[in-house]
Amino acid sequence: MESPLIYVSVLLLNIFEFSSGIVYNKDDTEKRFACSNKGFPQENEIIKLYLFLENLKIQCFFQTENEIASKAMLSVFTSGGLAPSLGIMNSTYNGIFHFNLTLFSDRILWLVDIPRENITQSTDIAAVEEWLVRITLHHGLNIYATEGTLLDVIREPILQWTPGDVIPESEISKLYPHVVDLKVTKCPCANDVALLGFIVDTIVDGVYIGITFGGFWHDYDTTWFNMTQTIYSQLQEEYEDLSLVDMVLTNHFLVILTSLGLFVSEDLRYPSRHSLSFSRADFCGFERVDYVKGKLWYNERCFANREHFEVDYVTVTFERNRTLSESSSCFYSQEPFLEWVPCLPHIFKGIKIFPTVLTFLVDQERGTGVYLFYNKVRKTAIASVSTLRNNEPNSQSKFPIFRFPSSFSSPVGMVFHPRSHFLYAYGNQIWLSVDGGNTFQLIANFHDDIIKKTFHSFYTSAITFVSQRGKVYSTKAGMGRYSAVGSVTERIFTLYYDHLGFLHKLTLGRFEASGPPTAFGNSRNLFGQPPDMGFETALAPQHTSLDEIIFFAYVPENEPQETIYSKKFGNIHYGKVIHSGKTGRAYIRKVLQHTTPKGFLSSVIAEMKEPFGLEEVNESSCLSSSLLINKAGNVYKLTLDSQVVQALFEDTDIEKTVVLPGYSSFLITSILDNKNALAIATMPESAPNNMTFLKSTWFLYNFGQRNGRTWKIYSKPCNYWFQHDDSPSLNIVKYIDLGNSYVLKAKVIRNAKGFRMLEIPLLTVFVGNPNLLEVTAEVTFDDTDSYVITISAASKVLHQGSTSLAFIMWSASTECFVTTMVPTLKSSCSYLRSMHHIPSKFIPFEDWISGVHKDSQGFNLIKTLPINYRPPSNMGIAIPLTDNFYHADPSKPIPRNMFHMSKKTGKFKQCANVSTREECNCTKDQKFSHAVAFSDCREKVPRFKFPITQYPVSLEIINEDGRVPLQSPYLVTVTEVNMRHNWKLKHTVPENIKRMKQLVEPILGAAVYNPSGLNLSIKGSELFHFRVTVISGVTFCNLIEEFQIYVDEAPLPFPGHTLIAVATAVVLGGLIFIAFMFQLQGIHPWRTFQRWIRRNQEKFSSISLSELIHRSKSEE
Amino acid sequence: QLCRSRTVRTGKVFNLIQDVQGDRLYFHPTTTRLIKHPCEKNIALYLGKQVFFTMDNFETSLLPFTIPTSMQVGVPEVTSAHFAGSLLLLVVDQKVYIYDYENNSWSMSLGIKHPVTHVSGDNCCYTGSLFCVHVSNLVFAYFRGDQISQTYIYYSNTGGFSFWKYHYDRQAEIIGSLGGIFHFFSLSQVAMLVVNQGKGMFKYSDHPLNRSFGLSFDYNGTLDILIAPGQRGILLLWFENSLLFSHNAGQLVDTVRVKKGDQTLFSSIFEAKITIHNIAVTENELAVITREDNLYYGNLGIVPSSIIKFADQYIWSEDVALMFRSPGTLEILTPLRDTAFPAFDFQKCLVNIQALLMDPELHVGKCKIEFLTGEFIYRMYTIDMHSQLELTASLIPQPGTSLIPLVMVSNPHSLGFQATFYENGYTSDGNTKYKLDIFLKQQQHWGRTDSNFTSSLKKATMSTLTVDIANKEISCVDIKPLSTLISVGCDLDKKIVIQNKVSACSMGILDPLTLQDNYSFIIEKEFYDPGFQGQQSSEDLHVFYSYQQLGCPLLVYYDTLWKPVVELWRKDSFQEVIDAEYVLLEVNGQFSYSYSLTAQSAMCTSQPQNWTTMIKEFGGPFFWNRENYVSCHDPNNNAPLRWPDVQYQILGGRTANQIIFGHNGFYVFYISIVDPYYSYCQLETIFSIYVYGAFPVQLVSAGVVILLIISSILGSVWLAYKTPKLLRTARGRRIKKCATQLCRRCKTVCQFRASATARAGTEPPGRHRTPHGGRSDH
């Protein structure tokens, strides 16, 4: 209960150390640190750290050319008082730890030792995000910042299991000849934890997987398992030809599709001693042939600090026409994947020729299911969205069905980019939907090549598409542009993005990574040299202004219809650079498709960065003459001056372009004779007719391809810096409670001067679920023409959920490290949000331990409770009636246990069924927790003098951003845990609160108080234990706080002392007064009494005398 | 083309031949040195075949520098020279001579009994700082190359006038010869260069660096050591074929590389096979001239230092020397002998470094810094105990580039910092401005160090803060690193004041006018001891009360336990009430006060110090201060608590000790804050108090007095009861009658007497009663 508090305070302490945002895409920051957990860190390696139960020890050194220089740099920094600092962050947490300064004669490395508790308190197994670590010199300055990861090995679910028999790598390599494909699935929260599965042919059978905890960087971080026996044990009969088909690792389960069925693991969070067991999901009527063609679909999302609305869904589709006996060829299930239901709602069943379901994905942000259908007969694909109601898709589609054009003839699948709301449909084209499947836009067209696999990195937003032919294309999430990056030559391979977004190529027996070891340089390309994205045709340049140029792509007249696309500019060229074979380059700004002029079916508008090289006279002799242009039907005839003998048209001049300033350009298509050539105009409207251009007033460009293509298209270097304030992480998760709001700020900085300024937004924002939160964006250009965007999100409805927000720098090059930032906003209660009671007198922690904290009067403010203490009840001090023990020790006698009722009540909680206090295992946190759940552990409570009047009950809310006092509308109810009375609360009730109170009180059936200015008065004695609860409906959080007050030095419950004292005083005073009055009045009771006595005596004696006389007389 | 030469030739128009008087000094026949005064630009000393001393930057023809014959030097060979403030120290013939150039006077320094060859020292150019004067005054004199175990090292704290023998800790155990001894103020350490078997290393005097030597380096030849100005801890060690460099006052010494563009050609001078003739150093620049007639230039940055070669030009001669005129302007100086005149002319060649670096063949990158400044440059700061300092610097990079600013301190063992770098607006041409906030406090309070990394918190130290750009190009000639001097020590503006809210004057007990009028008071001989030992003196002491100094005394009622309220003031503003430990001493030696606690009741774990022992130990009163105070609660203090009943004489701090007065009158107290962790300052003052309300000394014991009073009361009660009763008896009546008669008679007598008195009027009236009362007894 108390542990979150400590966690929060650690967190808060660290938050304030960050002062400025980090600028991404700056290319010149050198990565200089090499760090490791154990031993001497290796140079040029990605920093991979692992957190175990013990302290996290990290050694770092500064990488330079050689070892001596790196020692020298360490000493220079140390003697300058500089040591690096380590930032540990994930989407909700960031902490800063400093490497200590050490005399460099003592040590040649920097070392830091962080107790595990300072990073995380929990040790339970759960889906936890892998941390990002950033080591920088000079904390805060982001100098030599080097990134790495930190994995909590103790909590990562899959790492706690052995899913089969461990086998050595040598045995795995025996399989290689029989492997037909590889499958990788990674842990949604920690991408460095991944499973590699082998799909084997029918000769060998079995399920073989490798589990890595270090992102396949090294051989030693992968363990190989033979799961064949584990799978077979689930099958009643002996089957043959077992092979892996597909697998998905969700947050808490492992789902494996094999040729013999679909197997679902037990919950990975609760490991037992035996190895991982699976259960088989039954699909009636499906057999091996179907399973082999099956596919699993999963929307990858990390559910760290999971909330009730966060559930994993997995879909399985089979490539088979539905027969009458089968309900569907697509099934989906939610955690724990025991019940698989058909994807299609019942109503669809009636339709006769219904298209097959290629993919069904659950959009968790909007609570919908997205279908990708394919009609094999008509070869058309459609997308449809249905709202999920009670986990069943509604038969009515949410939006009108989206029909893809017929060019999207072979769709393969659909995938959500992890942790975001970008939906990609792929096949022979790539389509992107940013609105959850309502509409799609075309990103890429591959015509007859088909994209078979996609790979995603949530961290860098990078996406890689691999086609049937082994071509590799890459883009960034949400971007409208993409580029070709090369091709894969291996037959059997798969790709994999690790947690830091480094792409790995996994082939049989060989893992290649794109990151270092090439040290400080750029990352290595896994797919050969960056390919030229040009195509085989000639270009005709046309200047439109000084720095703007249009390139027309020439399509020869005789080009067959099917291959026309290969002579046209396409989407891929958008945002690329055209390089000339000579000099010059231009950035492509726009791609245009058109039907006129004839011969030019596409063009690009480009921004000239460097002028293009012209043809010289020695290359084209025609330039030494003037030029006459005549229209000849659709084409133009170019004629040279016959007087100039040396000026001739030659064969090499074909596909060169005549450029006339102020007029249309002409692409020479054929040479008629030495002096005449035919050409086509780029802009027939502005083409000159029957005009002569003198020598040197016309120019010739060569963008032809006849003698080898003279132009090339490559990716553009990164052109924007991206700055994100307030947070060091790109994938933050922010919680927005009811009535709260959050502001996000980002900035786009152009990184070079003389860049063309755009008036249109540089940044587009998409909201995953616009209905959840009120999101408004405000954009401005600042003094340096940087583009600043401020997004504010406020809670809107009493509905919990999460939505992703995406910032896309749409005009950034795909070469940029960051083009997209995807923060997640949750309309929910943050796990860091809690309510706290501020004690009226602060007592330092050391004093709590010692148990003595005296105020100025020497009154000890800490009461150490007696062992097995129970607070008194209304029936009397000695008759406790509560179930709660304090300072429990089962080995000691229980005091105040005389009465039957007291004996009946009182139950140990933490100490139940143990014999001594030690066995209760009370932690320090539990001992100092106010929570009633830990009352057994509680030893010391704050002590106050009787009576308590006007004790201020001040409460505050602690969240990520700091502390705020609790005030309306957070009204509270207050109860005494041990059902004691004799206390009273006083609070101010303004008019608005009065109404709220009247509204809420009948519903709750309890008194509701205004938390500001709440005062407590206690008339009783001994321990009071209060619980304050914030009423529901004002926050998503369950805000409860408890506090204790021990009232001491109370007077006796029976006012005997006072009564006796008063009575005595009254009696004494009365006596004195009477005596005085008697004296005054001259009454002397003593004398009277004496006299009376004397008289009596006399009387008596007389009587006796007479009697005596009488008696004697009678005797006589 | 490096530069164009010009010749300085002045004063030679008239045929006036000046004579060279005295012994002509010389340095070395083949090499030269040029020593510039670190603080005064135009003062320099040229050492070569001749020695020249200039006060105008060699802008006049000069006669060779001589030493008066009266100084009687044997061989006038100068081996070392050093500017200490306005003094020029020269080692001539193994003795140290002082030339005061302001007064043009020579003297010989005192105290040196053994031959020395070198003097070393540093200069601090922050004028008006007491600390800086101290820096300039500290000079070492030593014999270079002598075996350390038996050599004699001298130091002076008077700027070289008088020297004392310097005791280096365990000097006799150090094996090797002495390469030099220096006071590195940047590190607050004295460091000795130990040369042993071709390796040199620095040995430091104080914790935490005294445990081991600095890293060793190759020591070839006899290295000259130059401390770059600015107290940044930059050292240059050089010889003909060796040029070494240290950032951190010798802890790590590295070779200077020879580069071309980004490429390192040679990793040391030795590899480059060049022979250095002369070098010049400023705070961040380095120029080297070689025998091969090449000029090299480098800057002293954070990254390993390097030099680049400029185009060749014939400039070298045996007499040539280099000096920096200003940042980026190098002067090549050659003295020219004049056959007709004894005064030498000077050939000067001014090199504009910035212009030379523009040469594309040098492949020097463009400077990425547009602007770098901080408001703290050329200022000195003080950080006292627990105080903090915030400095800011601003930085503008060239558009589209990013800089790596590094903040460093020269002495991280005592000064720690945290820096933050952030965007802070834009310039008018749209360039982004950056700001660097540096937050400094004592390293011991950051908690980011190993326990043995920090120096003693008690000791005052100093450190230099430098802000430099790590990825600075050599072309950034005009962009100097920002640096400032920070003294972790006493803030001289601090003082203590005793709160005087209730003074004897304001309560009307004493009259300020009387006090100001040469007021004096007497301390009776029983109450004071001039020796502060608590012995009674033989005669009373007349003390003059200095109202000027003490003001009106604080009023203290005798019966209360008292301790002063000590306030800390900085300049004229109140800071806080001091809660640290302090001690009081009555300046006249009065001992009629005591302390409320004893060593035991103050919970001492060891024997506390007291005035008696302190006076004995330090030979006088008023020497108890933060330097010598040892707390009796200190767990490291191992003096056993032998006398637990002695008075605990330390007030303040964690104990509730107070003073008990036993006697009325004036007390003048000396107060000294002894807590070493309160401030680096020696906080002390004198104040006076006036104690009143004490009874005069009792002669009879209280019991007797009480008994007497009670018995007299009882007696009178008995009389009051008995008299009326007695009067009723016959005897009583007689007495009554007798008394009435007596009364009547008295009356007459009285009347008579009264009239008589009226006549005489001399007799005191008090006398009347006695006979009257006496007679009434009858």
UniProtKB/Swiss-Prot annotation, chain A:
Residues 1077-1116 are cytoplasmic. GO terms for biological process: cell differentiation; spermatogenesis. Keywords: Cell membrane, Cell projection, Cilium, Developmental protein, Differentiation, Disulfide bond, Flagellum, Glycoprotein, Membrane, Spermatogenesis, Transmembrane, Transmembrane helix. InterPro entries: CATSPERB, CATSPERB_2nd, CATSPERB_C, CATSPERB_head, CATSPERB_Ig-like, CATSPERB_N. The keyword Disulfide bond applies. It holds the Pfam family CATSPERB_2nd. Residues 1-1053 are extracellular. GO terms for cellular component: CatSper complex; cilium; plasma membrane; sperm principal piece. It is a single-pass membrane protein. Glycans are attached at N90, N100, N118, N226, N321, N618, N690, N913, N921, N1010, N1015. Disulfide bonds join C35-C60, C189-C302, C330-C343, C718-C816, C829-C1037, C911-C920, C922-C937. It is found in: Cell projection, Cilium, Flagellum membrane. The chain crosses the membrane at residues 1054-1076. The keyword Nucleotide-binding does not apply. Component of the CatSper complex or CatSpermasome composed of the core pore-forming members CATSPER1, CATSPER2, CATSPER3 and CATSPER4 as well as auxiliary members CATSPERB, CATSPERG, CATSPERD, CATSPERE, CATSPERZ, C2CD6/CATSPERT, TMEM249, TMEM262 and EFCAB9. HSPA1 may be an additional auxiliary complex member. The core complex members CATSPER1, CATSPER2, CATSPER3 and CATSPER4 form a heterotetrameric channel. Auxiliary component of the CatSper complex, a complex involved in sperm cell hyperactivation. Sperm cell hyperactivation is needed for sperm motility which is essential late in the preparation of sperm for fertilization. This is Cation channel sperm-associated auxiliary subunit beta.
